[in-house]
């Protein structure tokens, strides 16, 4: 069972915290992680790109000049792709990029992502993280205590004051535990999470 330090927001160690083997101590499956991240990024795409083909561009119904005798290359339409304002060859059209991810694969990927953070010593467990009012200085001070720059902060529930405190800090994102995903966990160098949020994760994935 992985054991990590338990800290307060000032960066002082207040004890040890045991993590579930079933969630934070599994073998990292890089293949599944890759598949899930590719699917997540694909699902974020709008797919609204659109350009006109030569059939859709207005004009160009008349041959621009006669076939022979002008000395110029033969042309059939001013809306052919080689012309300025002509149509696009194989023009992109709106499409759905979404990819379905099986629940079992999501679970394996989430456990692998969390376990990788433990193995790479990139996880920080906080005793608690509260704020009566938005105070960016407090979050900056906490990040400095853990030498954290590109950081994901995870709380048990949505906390407006914590969110407002961190939203102007470059490279820092605050999420409630219900909103975390594999991509967000892996793309940040430091994963700071409250012990109550850890308990929620273990309830779902253990």
UniProtKB/Swiss-Prot annotation:
Keywords: Ribonucleoprotein, Ribosomal protein, RNA-binding, rRNA-binding. The keyword Cell cycle does not apply. InterPro entries: Ribosomal_uL4, Ribosomal_uL4-like, Ribosomal_uL4_dom_sf. It comes from the Bacteria. Residues 44-76 are annotated as: Disordered. One of its GO terms (biological process) is translation. GO terms for cellular component: ribonucleoprotein complex; ribosome. The keyword Chaperone does not apply. One of the primary rRNA binding proteins, this protein initially binds near the 5'-end of the 23S rRNA. It is important during the early stages of 50S assembly. It makes multiple contacts with different domains of the 23S rRNA in the assembled 50S subunit and ribosome. Forms part of the polypeptide exit tunnel. Part of the 50S ribosomal subunit. This is Large ribosomal subunit protein uL4.
